[in-house]
Design a protein with these regions (language model features):
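Periplasm-facing N-terminal accessory domains of Gram-negative outer-membrane beta-barrel systems
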Residues: 2-138, 192, 207-209
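Short loop/turn motifs that connect adjacent beta-strands in outer-membrane beta-barrel proteins
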Residues: 223-226, 240-245, 287-290, 348, ...
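Solvent-exposed loop/turn elements at secondary-structure boundaries
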Residues: 152, 165, 558-578, 582-737, ...
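Short, solvent-exposed micro-motifs at the edges of structured domains
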Residues: 208, 274, 539-541, 555, ...
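Transmembrane beta-barrel strands of outer-membrane/channel proteins
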Residues: 121, 248-254, 295-299, 353-357, ...
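Periplasmic N-terminal accessory/gating domains of Gram-negative outer-membrane beta-barrel systems
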Residues: 86-239, 245, 254, 258-267, ...
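Transmembrane beta-barrel wall of Gram-negative outer-membrane proteins
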Residues: 245, 271-361, 379-408, 579
Length: 958
């Protein structure tokens, strides 16, 4: 009923699908000019001036009295309006943010043009031109909110409808919006910054130094934006102005500043948590009112040991012969640099060029080791470059063109850590992972290079009440990989491993995996997009945005002689048409209430790992992949491995289903927002999304099950022949299929205060529910369901909450910079103080209870659940986190200030779980040997979020 009523409402309201973040890195000022009686005034000259840089745009009102100034640089603005016979109107104090449509309505009084009516006011507290769901974190928030991680991507979690968890350094936070698991279109200045191989990965990390604003849109984005079913995260880099500004800072953390990490087995020694961060940046004019520069640099050196707790139990460590430290010793050295120039080529053409550099080294880079030994850790290097340019051109008063070009490259690799083990890697289910450091495709020996060239051009034509926009973009991606030569034994329990090690039973393992052959390969992918949209202001109270987007994905070439036919060539997905529409309706005479609605179809970006796996695991003698169970022919006796280069050893292949389609999601949203006075607003929103064609990996080679488990799951034969395998040349053929679905419903409540007298806040609550039958593996995603599908015959067995489903979330950001009208000692003490508070209260993420053995003989370990246990049926405890930043300013000269900064992560040191060891011992039918815990926190913890951390900083600004 909810779904039907929601769809009916939006269909009647807008007859289409969603959006209106019409500009990626710019903003729009628009409005209606009337006389004192309310009659519209055509022919009014409206001049829009950027008070920071001197840029000027002139618009003329049409027959409906409407004017539009689009593709404006961010910053402060002055709007003036002139018409013969009327007094001149001038308004200052307008601040324009990324993607914002600032509605400035003007009322002209009769009189001489020489008479000036001056107004100082910002846009209305309720955004009358906004259609999409999302928010902009402005420069004040970016610089004032606590961020001990130095990772601005964590700010996405301060957006209503976004769930997941942050990272403690420059890694990738796990983010989900609209129930679209880990689907994020990362952008820098509107240019693509999304890594193409797996879901949830950004390419270039960002530093606070490199960001002016963050624009987060969760749904309702215009046809101009695509290649995601989730959210758009757009980081806007700073620009110089006519005034020279800059800063230099130093921040530090030390061991005494931090509490003990959560779930530490040995609390005798606190781990090192040293952090040293140096930053410097400056911006200003090269030629006043015409050419401006910005440059910045950061070097962050951090000891990660305190966040990397090893939780192998003492009895298991002793039995396995492991001597593990309490913490994974790990340290990083990270450098950022940015340079940017903005130049007004002429009155009609503006150029912006920027370059970003990133370099990173982390020793023993294993983010949350849990039961993983230091033997398995590897050292990680990562270097990136991004160069981009934008040209904005105006032709007369009604045609604008925006062109963007970008070239970005990322190169990373891993080598064994200083304490790496030798021999094959070993996993003992639920106990420990140790041995050699090469257990998977991304371990030691892994190499990755991705180059992206992007070109984009958009043309806007303003005609009457319409702003038509058409555009295209092309992305050309080249990937080069070096595949690890991994060797991995998996055992069901400690006793089985000990028996194998002693020689009593060298075949007591669950399975053995190995890869050998040519390690390096490369492939190319191309993506094209076309869109057309109309931003139609039907009246001063109602605006409709509708349009159509088309994405075309050209996958890599197949493997010409692949043994699996479907891997010889991959189908091009070219039918991705996406209708979208949205509206904003201003209600009431006081213009303080707006109703927004949007609905539309969004397509995902292609996950290149889908094709990559088929290329590298083609089943040929050129590259060999093997998965063997002990009873199968050719299975080695522990600890032996297979001799490389033998054709008989290659018994595992990957492919892409010939009917594979790019995933898509239909999103619908409605929001009612009400302004309360001049400072406050409250909003109520409802969302519903439905995902289709979600990717899952299936072993399609299994046929003729030999039995069932008590709960009905099929059991397969371990024999490999024509009666048990569709293609008896292989034990397993893993095909990526687009057969899964998702469902998401949410209610959001939001209460905001705009910045006034030194205080602003944004508070929000989301009640959401996400379900799917798409257990995505870490092969395709940065955060995956361990093992993937648990039943290769029935996908509905895996329907349940997805891995980042959080039913309740409350988030808040508060910035306070009070300035009191006091002099003397009182004024000196109470003024020049700044506070930033970030709040995150959320339900715990799901826990998937897993069996310690392969119950159905599908060759996939750690994916099966005990008999009768549903997927993700338990949850971790709720998370309550408060971060605080306090700084004290010391004015030295008119434009020179010193600042002392104190930041606290997890102020109250509340215990925060991020993972448990949920593997339970079962018999051959999946019956547990002991009662299964009824709560997620009854399992042994494998790690937590950050304990209380204190960071001290010093900064000078000018």
């Amino acid at each position: 009923m909810f779904r039907a009523l929601f769809a009916l409402f939006l269909t009647l309201a807008v007859a289409g699908s969603a959006a209106a973040q019409g500009q990626a890195i710019n903003g729009t000022i628009e409005g209606t000019v009337t006389d004192e009686s309310g009659g519209v005034l055509p022919g009014v000259t409206v001049t829009v001036t950027n008070t920071d840089t001197g840029d000027t745009r002139v618009a003329v009102t049409n027959e409906s009295g409407i004017y539009r100034a689009m593709l404006l640089p961010l910053g402060g603005y002055r709007v003036s309006a002139e018409l013969a016979g009327f007094k001149k109107y001038e308004q200052v104090g307008i601040t324009l943010g990324a993607g914002q449509v600032a509605v400035i309505n003007v009322k002209l009084g009769v009189g001489a043009v020489s008479e000036v009516v001056s107004v100082t006011a910002d846009t209305p507290v309720v955004d009358l031109g906004k259609i999409e769901q999302g928010r902009t974190l402005n420069e004040r928030e970016i610089k004032s909110l606590p961020l001990t991680s130095r990772n601005p991507y964590n700010f996405a979690l301060l957006q209503p409808g976004v769930v997941g968890f942050e990272t403690q350094e420059f890694g990738v936070p796990r983010l989900t919006a609209n129930g679209a698991l880990l689907r994020v279109n990362y952008q820098i200045d509107g240019n693509d910054n999304t890594q193409k191989d797996r879901a949830g990965l950004r390419q270039m990390p960002m530093s606070e130094v490199m960001i002016r604003e963050v624009k987060v849109v969760t749904t309702g984005y215009a046809p101009e934006f695509g290649q995601t079913m989730g959210m758009v995260y757009n980081a806007i880099t700073p620009s110089g102005t006519n005034a020279v500004h800059g800063q230099a800072s130093y921040r530090l953390q030390r061991k005494p500043f931090a509490a003990f990490p959560f779930f530490t087995a040995n609390r005798a020694t606190k781990p090192p948590t040293d952090v040293n961060v140096f930053t410097i940046d400056a911006g200003g004019p090269i030629v006043r009112d015409r050419t401006h520069y910005f440059a910045g640099f950061e070097n962050s050196r951090r000891d990660f040991s305190g966040g990397r707790v090893i939780t192998i139990s003492q009895p298991n460590a002793a039995a396995l012969g492991l001597n593990e430290p309490a913490y994974m010793p790990s340290a990083g050295d990270t450098k950022f640099a940015i340079g940017k120039v903005d130049h007004q080529l002429s009155q009609a053409h503006r150029l912006s060029v920027r370059y970003i550099f990133f370099d990173n080294f982390i020793s023993n880079n294993l983010g949350n080791p849990g039961i993983t030994s230091v033997q398995r850790a590897s050292d990680f290097t990562d270097r990136q470059h991004s160069t981009a340019g934008q040209v904005v051109s105006t032709f007369g008063n009604n045609i604008l063109n925006e062109m963007r070009v970008q070239y970005a490259t990322r190169s990373q690799g891993r080598v064994p850590g200083s304490q790496a083990g030798t021999g094959p890697a070993i996993n003992v289910a639920g106990a420990a992972s140790f041995g050699g450091p090469i257990a998977g495709a991304a371990d030691a020996g892994f190499g990755f290079t991705e180059n992206i060239f992007q070109v984009l051009d958009n043309v806007t034509y303003i005609s009457g009440d319409h702003a038509f926009k058409v555009g295209f973009s092309g992305q050309f991606v080249k990937d080069t990989r070096t595949q690890t030569q991994f060797q991995l034994y998996t055992f069901p329990n400690v006793a089985s491993f000990l028996a194998a090690r002693s020689g009593a039973n060298p075949f007591g393992y669950s399975n053995f995996q190995q890869f050998f052959g040519e390690p390096s390969y490369e492939y190319n992918t191309n993506m094209w997009a076309f869109f057309v949209q109309d931003d139609w202001r039907l009246s001063s109270d109602f605006k409709l945005l509708y349009g159509l987007r088309h994405d075309i994905y050209a996958p890599p070439d197949g493997v010409q002689n692949a043994l699996v036919e479907s891997s010889r060539g991959f189908e091009r997905d070219a039918n991705n048409w996406q209708p979208r529409a949205g509206f904003v309706w201003t209600l009431g005479q006081d213009r303080r209430t707006v109703l927004r609605g949007n609905t539309g179809l969004m397509y995902d970006q292609p996950l290149n790992a889908i094709y990559e796996q088929a290329i590298v695991n083609d089943g040929s003698t050129r590259r060999g992949a093997v998965t063997l169970q002990p009873a199968q022919a050719g299975a080695p006796a522990f600890p032996n491995v297979l001799a490389g280069g033998t054709a008989a050893a290659s018994n595992t292949a990957w492919t892409v289903d010939p009917d594979f389609q790019i995933a898509r999601m239909w999103q619908s949203n409605v929001q009612l927002e009400r302004g309360i006075g001049e400072l406050y607003s409250a909003a109520l929103g409802l969302s519903y999304t439905r995902g289709y064609d979600l990717p899952v990996v299936t072993n399609t080679n299994l046929i003729n099950p030999i039995g069932t488990l008590p709960d009905g799951r099929a059991i397969w034969s371990t024999a490999i022949n024509a009666n048990t395998r569709r293609d008896p040349r292989f034990n397993a053929i893993f095909a990526t299929q687009s057969i899964a679905e998702s469902d998401y419903k949410a209610l959001t409540l939001q209460f905001t205060r705009r910045f006034h007298r030194g205080i602003q806040w944004d508070l929000a609550y989301t009640l959401g529910k996400s379900e799917d039958n798409a257990p995505i593996t870490s092969t395709l995603s940065v955060q995956g369901d361990t093992g993937g599908r648990s039943d290769q015959a029935d996908l509905e067995v895996d329907r349940g909450p997805h891995i980042l489903d959080q039913r309740h979330t409350f988030i808040g950001s508060i910035v306070a910079q009070p300035q009191l009208d006091l002099s003397g000692v009182g004024g000196a003490i109470l003024n020049n103080n700044q506070f930033g508070i970030a709040l995150q209260f959320a339900s715990g993420i799901p826990v998937n209870v897993r069996a310690n053995r392969d119950l159905n003989n599908d060759g996939i370990v750690n994916s099966d659940r005990p008999n009768g246990v549903a997927r993700n049926s338990l949850n971790l405890p709720a998370r309550y986190n408060v971060d605080l930043r306090y700084s004290r300013l010391f004015p030295i000269a008119r434009t020179f200030k010193a600042e002392v900064i104190a930041e606290l992560k997890n102020v109250f040191n509340t215990v925060q779980w991020n993972g448990v060891n949920s593997v339970v011992t079962v018999d051959a039918l999946g019956n547990p040997a002991a009662p299964i815990p009824s709560e997620g926190d009854m399992f042994p913890a494998t790690g937590g979020y950050e304990q209380r951390q204190f960071q001290l900083g010093f900064r000078v600004t000018f």
